[in-house]
Amino acid sequence: MGLCFLFFLELLEYLYYNACMPKVLTKEQIEQYHEEGFVFPIRVMSKDEALTIATKIEEVERLFPEEIHAENRNNLHLSFSFLDKLVHNKIVVDAMEDLLGPDLALWATVMFIKEPSSEHYVSWHQDATYMGMNSNRFATPWISLSTCNRETGCMTMIPGTHLQEIVSHEDTFDNDNILTRGQVIKNIDESLGVDLILEPGEMSIHSGTVVHASRPNRSNKRRVGFALQSYMAPNIKQVLGENIWTHVRGKQRSDADGMTLDRPKYDMDPITVAQRKVANKNLALILYKDSDLKRNY
């Protein structure tokens, strides 16, 4: 798909949603998203509510160490009902509707945790590179559950890079790189980067093709972010694996070979815990397709 056509699609989205009354985002924020590929900050909940969720995460880490640990942080919304509530949070979903329309499904979630004074980082990349969708028109809310700034290793994004096609990535499998393959885009002008500084309870939203990264956490506190990766319209299909989704709002998906995930009725609901294993196995097959190496996440 050419650059001009991608820009045309972005323009159509911008014109359509500016003709409607947005539910959460201002018209200026919608314009920023379409021009730069990201928008922030958006208040989702109070600081105290966010910190309470961060404390709850530490609690379930202690109670269920096999279910949530450094190599098992994908799709935690299927194991813990308090994270499922974030997936369906009205402010989050209304903001997604402002950008993508009223029919929404969610592909996966990822809990990004950087421990204090650690070397873990995220290299320059585009999310859509290995996601295996037939279209890259989707968006990821990233909810901050701690203070996210330069010291703690906040995300940095290059404005406007979402309008290009997927560029070449090199798989490094660097042990300190949080990304599955340690994939990296070389020769990025980091001086163009914008730091997405967020307080607890705020979120950013970014496009699947915007180039972004994050540095190590040099502070003495945990940096915690919950990425809802990604919301998309029901007509977007998975081409590398099974079509497994969480229904969020509006029209239901109708994949003949697909699977709609249930919502957990309570923490560690055995039905959705089992579904999480299926979803994570499918996710790994997609993200590591054609790779000779594979990590445990």
Question: What is each residue range found by the language model?
Answer:
Residues Y121-T129, I205-R215, M232:
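Histidine-centered catalytic micro-motifs
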Residues R150-R215:
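Double-stranded beta-helix
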Residues P102, A128-M133, I143-C154, G160-H162:
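Active-site region of the double-stranded beta-helix
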Residues G132-R150, I197, L228-M232:
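Short, conserved beta-strand element in jelly-roll/cupin
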Residues L63, V210-V211, R215-Y297:
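Non-heme Fe(II)/2-oxoglutarate
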Residues M21-M133, H169-E170:
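Non-heme Fe(II)-dependent double-stranded beta-helix
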Residues L3-E35, V273, Y288-Y297:
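Fe(II)/2-oxoglutarate
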Residues Q126-F138, S191-L192, L198, K221-R222:
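A short beta-loop-beta micro-motif enriched in histidine and acidic residues
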